[in-house]
Amino acid sequence: HFRLAIMNTDVRRGVRIKKEEIMAVDFENSQTKKNLEAAFAGESQAHTKYEYYASKAKKEGYVQISNIFTETSGNEKEHAKLWFKYLHNGEVPTTAVNLADAAAGENYEWTDMYAGFARTAKEEGFTEIAAKFALVGAIEKAHEERYKKLLSSVEDGSVFSREGVKVWKCLNCGHLHVGATAPKVCPTCNHPQSYFEEQVVNY
């Protein structure tokens, strides 16, 4: 809880007594939390926007300006991370928590947000935008399903283990390992198991 201390005095029998009145504010219901959420949203938006600006400046031949936009975008990203961590007890949550949160966010986007946006755009005569809202909503649905599947893999310990023989690829050096489970350590570059993924050939 954030606490505000207010000092005042009380006079009793000629003795000046200092009292401290403590007003406790629950963080979850505080204006400060709302301000942190607004700050996180604003900085995140600025980070993304400046990346677009940097790309445009570079295309127009302003390399120095592009670099400044890129640098500032990085600053905004760190500002956003600072506020995000305050909103989550001083740290980024675990991957399992993040996957669950991401799935919930994607669910809201495709079931509520984009569905409503598409309906409104269509009613207002913006048919192209309505169609784009609907198409992106379908993508968000796929995102939700992917996050849920990944969360299930984290929870049941199958991220680095599969039924049957699989080919695992080290994302650092490209080493290929055949087996049901990825090796604990890459025998070629010594990177940990976390660098392995099941190889999927799509060419």
Residue ranges and their predicted role:
Residues 22-203:
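Non-heme di-metal
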